A protein has these predicted regions:
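A glycine/threonine-rich phosphate-anchoring loop and its flanking beta-alpha core
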Residues: 112-205
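Non-catalytic interfacial helical region
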Residues: 84-101, 110-125
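ATP/NTP phosphate-donor binding region
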Residues: 1-97
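Solvent-exposed alpha-helices and their adjacent loops that cap or buttress functional pockets
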Residues: 5, 31, 91-93, 116-118, ...
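C-terminal charged capping/lid subdomain of soluble metabolic enzymes
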Residues: 182-184, 283-361
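Active-site segments that bind and position negatively charged phosphate/pyrophosphate groups
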Residues: 197-313
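Residue-level signal for inorganic ion chemistry
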Residues: 16, 38, 76, 127, ...
Length: 361
């Protein structure tokens, strides 16, 4: 169990096999409300809506099931409005709560619905993908996309509980699982050189989804995220390090209309390019930049991208809409060495063009 230390808003991250069966009991113990809704998507719902629903019923709740389309395109204000309508139709009140059952899209969407419906009701995260378990379910960032860019509408709104059931990873498609490894690798780059070295050594165990290896890695990633969020909840400084690779990654997602790349795949490309920028601007040793590229490739993730001139123009336009832009300047998180990064680094467009054209030898 990992605790996110936020004073009277602190909460637990429970990580184990079979914790989904405890959902109802844990919600009842926390007295989250009298009524509840499960928000899930068409893919996850097939596997896990019934056990979640049954657990809540056993604890005395009468849950409402809200099913949204699967995929990044569902992370929109249109879907938010549809969720509001269903909650209102079933007369959920202030003393109600939402269960976000799914991956990062569902967690961000359902969390934003919880943050804004009736000016805020409680919610619980039940992440069912590796990416969501190690990253997006923890820390309270919730929101949706606009056509112009990713996560441009959102809030900081903490869950009351995070339940990471490792059994849910068994049904995860291989591509989705590998995409989640991008965020796992990120934690080694930004915070923990020993974790990075372990990933270089033990990546085959993770790719085989060995339970002990997964449990340890998910817990360590959650510990790092909890430590960072506990010090800087609303990204005034330190929390920005969690965005390593995300400036370019989010822009890639936006210009491909959230269809070509999974989130983790785009972030993997962004991390490789951020490592190249780091080698040029913040003294990251070239051998470390190569290690970053190699471990991403070993995880089966893309570490390069080819863009036409028109696509580059659109990429820069999307990056200028990034939340980290200040005074019209694109700001990056860059690495000094594996395990240590700096944030708020100004990077001129010409430098980004150079790394887009470069290769690591």
């Amino acid at each position: 169990m990992v605790k996110v230390p936020l004073g009277n808003r602190s909460y637990e991250i429970q990580i184990a096999s079979g914790v989904l069966a405890r959902l109802g009991r844990e919600c009842a113990r926390r007295k989250l409300g009298e009524r509840c809704a499960i928000i899930t998507d068409t893919n996850v719902g097939r596997h896990f809506a019934k056990p979640a629903f049954d657990s809540l019923v056993r604890a005395g709740f009468a849950p409402v099931l809200v099913i949204v389309p699967a995929g990044e395109e569902a992370k929109s204000l249109k879907t938010v409005h549809a969720c509001y309508d269903q909650l209102a139709a079933h007369r959920l009140e202030r003393k109600s709560f939402i269960v976000a059952l799914g991956g990062g899209v569902v967690g961000d969407l359902a969390g934003f619905v919880a943050a804004t419906y009736l000016r805020g009701i409680a919610f619980v995260q039940v992440p069912t993908t590796l990416l969501a378990q190690v990253d997006s379910s923890v820390g309270g960032k919730v929101g949706v996309n606009l056509k112009a860019g990713k996560n441009l509408v959102g809030a900081f709104y903490q869950p009351r509980l995070v339940l990471c059931d490792l059994d849910t990873l068994r049904t995860l498609p291989e591509r989705e699982f590998r995409a989640g490894l991008a965020e796992v690798i990120k934690y080694g780059i930004i915070y923990d050189a020993r974790l990075f070295a372990r990933l270089e050594r033990d990546l085959p165990k993770l790719l085989r989804r060995e339970h002990a290896a997964l449990a340890d890695i998910v817990a360590r990633c959650c510990q790092i995220k909890a430590e960072v969020v506990g010090q800087d909840e609303t990204e005034g400084g330190l929390r920005a390090i969690l965005n390593f690779g995300h400036t370019i990654g989010h822009a890639l997602e936006a210009i491909s209309h959230y269809g070509k790349f999974l989130h983790g795949e785009a972030i993997a490309i962004g991390q490789t390019l951020a490592a190249r920028l780091s080698a040029r601007q913040t003294g990251l040793p070239q051998r470390d930049a190569i290690r970053i590229s190699n471990v991403l490739a070993a995880a089966g993730l893309p570490n390069c991208v080819r863009l036409t001139q028109r696509q580059r123009e659109r990429l820069f336009a999307a990056m200028h809409l990034d939340k980290k832009v200040s005074g019209g300047e694109i700001k990056f998180v860059l690495a000094r060495r594996i395990g240590e990064v700096v944030w708020g680094q100004r990077v001129p467009e010409v430098a980004i063009c150079r790394v887009l054209d470069s290769r690591l030898d």
